[in-house]
C-alpha cells in the first residue's frame, strides 16, 4: 500500500502489476538516456564555438533524427501493446464478482452464489479503531481467494466512477448502462486498498475499496457463513 512521501509505485501483488513495473522502468531508462543526450548537446552549444553556421542542409543528420525517434517509439510501443493485450485477456476465471458504483459507495455481488451480495461504505473517521487507515477502511471488505483468477464485472448505477486498486494494477471505468470487465490474481494474502478514480461528485474522495485476499479454504469458510 502507499505510504507518506512515497515517490515510486506501490509494491506489485499481481502478474499484471509486475509487468507494469518492468515497463515503467524500461520507459524511464529511455527517457533518462534522451534527457542525458539533450543536456549534453545543450552543454556543447554553450561551451563550444559554433562552426559551419552557414550550412543550410545536412541529409545525414536529418536521416538520423528521423529514424532514431521512430526506433525509440517502437521500443516503447511493443512492450506496451503486449501488456494491453494481457490486461484484456479473460483466462477461465474461477470466480466472478459484479461491482456497481453508487454515489458514494460500492456494492458487490458474487454471481456464482445465490445470495451473496453487500454494500461497502467508508468507515467515518470518528468510528475508526486504533491502527485503521483514515478514508480507506470500509465496513464490508471484498474477500477473494488468492492465486486464482477472479473476473470483475464493473458498472455504475448513476454517474461515472472508476474502480481502481493500484497494487494489483487495476483501473476500470464504471459506466452507467455498460458492463466492463477485468481480471485479477493476487500472488500473496493481505489487504489491498484502492479508491474511486473518477470525480463523481462531492463525496468522490469517500469511496474506498478494500480487497482481502485469503487462501481458498478461508474463502470457502467465509462464503458459507455469508450465504
UniProtKB/Swiss-Prot annotation:
Keyword DNA damage applies: no
Residues that bind Cu cation A2: 196, 198, 200, 204
Gene3D superfamilies: 1.10.287.90, Cupredoxins - blue copper proteins
Protein location: Mitochondrion inner membrane
Transmembrane segments annotated in the record for this chain: 15-45, 60-87
Main location: mitochondrion
Reactions that this protein is recorded to catalyse: 4 Fe(II)-[cytochrome c] + O2 + 8 H(+)(in) = 4 Fe(III)-[cytochrome c] + 2 H2O + 4 H(+)(out)
Disulfide bonds: none
InterPro entries associated with the record: CcO_II, CcO_II-like_C, CcO_II_C, Copper_CuA, Cupredoxin, Cyt_c_oxidase_su2, Cyt_c_oxidase_su2_TM_dom, Cyt_c_oxidase_su2_TM_sf
Mitochondrial matrix side: 46-59
Segments in the Mitochondrial intermembrane topological domain: 1-14, 88-227
CC annotations in GO: mitochondrial inner membrane; respiratory chain complex IV
Assigned EC number: 7.1.1.9
List of residues binding Mg(2+): 198
PROSITE patterns, per the entry: COX2, COX2_CUA, COX2_TM
Membrane topology summary: Multi-pass membrane protein
Binding, Cu cation A1: 161, 196, 200, 207
Reported cofactor(s): Cu cation
Keywords: Copper, Electron transport, Magnesium, Membrane, Metal-binding, Mitochondrion, Mitochondrion inner membrane, Phosphoprotein, Respiratory chain, Translocase, Transmembrane, Transmembrane helix, Transport
Pfam families named among the record's database cross-references: COX2, COX2_TM
Record's cofactor remark: Binds a dinuclear copper A center per subunit.
Domain of life: Eukaryota
Subunit record text: Component of the cytochrome c oxidase (complex IV, CIV), a multisubunit enzyme composed of 14 subunits. The complex is composed of a catalytic core of 3 subunits MT-CO1, MT-CO2 and MT-CO3, encoded in the mitochondrial DNA, and 11 supernumerary subunits COX4I, COX5A, COX5B, COX6A, COX6B, COX6C, COX7A, COX7B, COX7C, COX8 and NDUFA4, which are encoded in the nuclear genome.
Function, as annotated: Component of the cytochrome c oxidase, the last enzyme in the mitochondrial electron transport chain which drives oxidative phosphorylation. The respiratory chain contains 3 multisubunit complexes succinate dehydrogenase (complex II, CII), ubiquinol-cytochrome c oxidoreductase (cytochrome b-c1 complex, complex III, CIII) and cytochrome c oxidase (complex IV, CIV), that cooperate to transfer electrons derived from NADH and succinate to molecular oxygen, creating an electrochemical gradient over the inner membrane that drives transmembrane transport and the ATP synthase.
Family stated for the protein in its record: Belongs to the cytochrome c oxidase subunit 2 family.
Name of protein: Cytochrome c oxidase subunit 2
Lineage: Eukaryota, Metazoa, Chordata, Craniata, Vertebrata
Gene that encodes it: MT-CO2
